[in-house]
Design a protein with these regions (language model features):
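Short, mixed-charge low-complexity intrinsically disordered segments
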Residues: 36-77
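Short aromatic-glycine-(Arg/Gly/Cys) micro-motifs in beta-strand/loop hairpins
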Residues: 1-38, 64
Length: 77
């Protein structure tokens, strides 16, 4: 179980994860806690904002929301 902040879409149905090669990012549907365990989880809000801005500047992602991963785990527990 992770803790910290993740980047997800506005309806909280997809979460940002690293690709298996760890050279890019992809949005995965939040269907189980296994997906949340694979999510790119950042320890603090400042770091999450910096990563979000960097990804937007490089046009790798669109607008994403920063949420506490515990909020997503509540869907399953």
């Amino acid at each position: 179980m992770q803790r910290g902040y993740v980047l997800c879409n506005y309806d909280l149905s997809q979460v940002l994860c690293l690709t298996p090669e760890k050279d890019g990012v992809v949005l995965h549907d939040v269907t189980s806690t296994k997906v949340l365990n694979k999510a790119m989880c950042l320890p603090d809000l400042t770091e999450a904002k910096n990563v979000s801005q960097m990804l937007q500047d490089k046009d790798l992602t669109g607008d994403l929301e920063i949420v506490n991963v515990a909020r997503l785990y509540k869907k399953f527990f």
